[in-house]
Amino acid sequence: MIPLSIRVPASTANVGPGFDSVGIALSLYLHVVVKEKSDKWQVIHSFEDSIPTDDKNLIVSTACKVCPSLSPHIIEVTSNIPLTRGLGSSASAIVAGIELANQLGKLNLTTDQKVQIATNFEGHPDNVAASILGGTVIGALDGKNVSVVRIESKELGVISLIPNEELNTDESRSVLPDVFPFHEAVKASAISNVLVAALCQKKWEVVGEMMEMDHFHEPYRLELVPLLPSIRKCAKEFGAYGTALSGAGPSIFILTPYEKRQEIAEQLARVFTSMKVCELEIDHRGITVNKKEHIGL
């Protein structure tokens, strides 16, 4: 019998100008199945060898930081979220670790507490809040306190173009400027404000326009993801609302009318044959837990 299983959705962050603030949960998933107690933590997985199988694994290390008194268990981890592709793989692992601690340690954490803890680990709320809450989230971290608003976007379809090449988040962040001119900050913030307002009012054409006008990060990351302009042009011609980098890249994130997502994905797949084109949906449930029997420390 499976005593406890945890499912965490992938996420995309930024949506163009919503840098480190706007996130959307996606229909790719990390699954953690908790098995029996053990004398030490064991993580069963089929990922690359660089992913730890002991207490150094990000899921386990996060859980133990949240609840140091946890007894070791054997856990099995599976995932179809690509690693280091800008789809929130590390955020999903952090969220899974927090929930693992919450369940095994009987912490009774509220959703707000989970978001706060996850943001403290991640450094920004966009990916982790989306994975916890589902849907579309807009968040802000003010010192130690995080504020998050969740909205529904069920009319939207999602397409992700995933290259074979990995792109480490630290490398992608290293090309960003340390200082942002005031007039550029004003312009970039105004665009981000309109993006959020359009998301809330479901003005999808405006969302698409704003998500392609970022000044905060995409201009600096183009050298790392040179196909973005051509993908953006084709997606618009095929009927998409808008295209942006998914998180720090290298994956590309496209919003479409829900009923057109398959058609647009097929057209893009014929053009960009070197990339994996995934027709996705927005996950509206967020993290889910399935308990089969009582577990204690």
From Swiss-Prot:
Protein name: Homoserine kinase
Recorded superkingdom: Bacteria
Binding site for ATP: P82, L83, T84, R85, G86, L87, G88, S89, S90, A91, S92
InterPro entries: GHMP_kinase_C_dom, GHMP_kinase_C_sf, GHMP_kinase_N_dom, GHMP_knse_ATP-bd_CS, Homoserine_kinase, Ribosomal_Su5_D2-typ_SF, Ribsml_uS5_D2-typ_fold_subgr
SUPFAM superfamilies: GHMP Kinase, C-terminal domain, Ribosomal protein S5 domain 2-like
Role according to the record: Catalyzes the ATP-dependent phosphorylation of L-homoserine to L-homoserine phosphate.
Catalytic EC class: transferase
Location of this chain's protein in the cell: Cytoplasm
Keywords noted in UniProt: Amino-acid biosynthesis, ATP-binding, Cytoplasm, Kinase, Nucleotide-binding, Threonine biosynthesis, Transferase
Assigned EC number: 2.7.1.39
Family: Belongs to the GHMP kinase family. Homoserine kinase subfamily.
Reaction it catalyzes: L-homoserine + ATP = O-phospho-L-homoserine + ADP + H(+)
Main location, first listed in the record: cytoplasm
UniProt GO molecular function: ATP binding; homoserine kinase activity
Organism of this sequence: Bacillus thuringiensis (strain Al Hakam)
Pathway noted in the entry: Amino-acid biosynthesis; L-threonine biosynthesis; L-threonine from L-aspartate: step 4/5
Pfam families: GHMP_kinases_C, GHMP_kinases_N
Biological-process GO terms, alphabetical: threonine biosynthetic process
GO CC term, one of those recorded: cytoplasm
Transmembrane stretches, start-end: none
